[in-house]
């Protein structure tokens, strides 16, 4: 797998996270998830996601149970 294979479109990243592309777009606009904004091409800038960033973001959002078995 090349380094470019680790660059995901919105649809690919959404599939990896098992959420809709619209949900991922909302998270991105609210800056809740890391993304890469390429230089503008005309009126818009292509958005991509790095697989490593997505996986790290997932690790950071694991909710661990406390001693009583309830979410902390």
Where are these regions (language model features)?
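A residue-level structural signature of the nucleotidyltransferase/glycosyltransferase Rossmann-like core
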Residues: 5, 46-47
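Polyanion-binding surface elements
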Residues: 1-30, 60
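Short Lys/Arg-enriched helix C-cap and helix-to-coil transition segments
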Residues: 36-46
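A short, Lys/Arg-enriched interface patch at domain edges and termini
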Residues: 51-72
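Helix N-cap / beta->alpha transition motif
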Residues: 9, 50-51
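Proline- and acidic/polar-enriched loop/turn elements at helix boundaries
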Residues: 26, 39-40, 70
């Amino acid at each position: 797998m090349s380094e470019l294979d680790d660059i995901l479109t919105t649809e690919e990243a959404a599939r990896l996270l098992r959420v809709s592309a619209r949900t991922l777009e909302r998270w991105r606009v609210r800056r809740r998830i890391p993304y890469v904004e390429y230089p503008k091409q005309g009126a818009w800038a292509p958005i991509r996601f790095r697989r490593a960033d997505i996986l790290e973001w997932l690790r950071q959002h694991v909710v661990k149970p406390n001693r009583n078995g309830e979410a902390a």
